[in-house]
């Protein structure tokens, strides 16, 4: 593993998009290592799951909250989310995963005589995806802080189908960041 490198600035240096991206990558990597190695992964606050709806249209509701995924990404949920669930099954995990979403398209400078300039995103939004998974892999970290095995996400609950309806499994231990 190579030690992290940050940009060295000096007067007269020409900065490129690659340099600015490297600067962002350095600080994001540092923040994510900090989150992963000092706090672990899991729910920090909120993100409680409840089963709502009836037997013909069941759904789960996740309340606002904050989590850190196994890679150190911060996941912020600002408003309640409702996700439909199948009418029957055996068990499901409710999992939240970090996602980056390119946004705010702007034209790319090109030939002024060219009427249709290419558009590229000027921002990247830190968002998330809420998933239902029949199986959820266990995660483990090696001594160097690398995460191995399975998809990156935070399981918020396990749902069990019992007596013709979904219920939150109270025995399931939600991982907690500290």
Regions found by a protein language model. Give the residues of each.
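Beta-strand-rich solenoidal segments
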Residues: 1-9, 59-178
């Amino acid at each position: 593993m190579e030690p992290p490198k940050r940009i060295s600035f000096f007067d007269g240096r020409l900065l490129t998009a690659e340099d600015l991206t490297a600067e962002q990558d350095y600080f994001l990597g540092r923040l994510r290592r900090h989150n992963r190695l000092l706090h672990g992964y899991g729910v920090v606050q909120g993100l409680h799951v409840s089963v709502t709806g009836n037997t013909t249209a069941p759904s789960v509701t996740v309340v606002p909250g904050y989590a850190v995924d196994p890679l150190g990404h911060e996941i912020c949920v600002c408003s309640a989310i409702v996700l439909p669930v199948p009418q029957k099954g055996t068990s499901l995990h409710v999992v939240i995963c970090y996602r980056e979403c390119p946004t705010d398209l702007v034209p790319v400078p090109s030939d002024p005589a060219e009427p249709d300039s290419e558009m590229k995103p000027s921002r990247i939004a830190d968002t998330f995806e809420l998933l239902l998974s029949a199986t959820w892999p266990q995660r483990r970290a090696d001594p160097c802080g690398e995460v191995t095995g399975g998809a990156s996400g935070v399981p918020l609950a396990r749902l069990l189908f019992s007596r013709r309806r979904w219920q939150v499994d109270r025995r399931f231990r939600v991982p907690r960041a500290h």
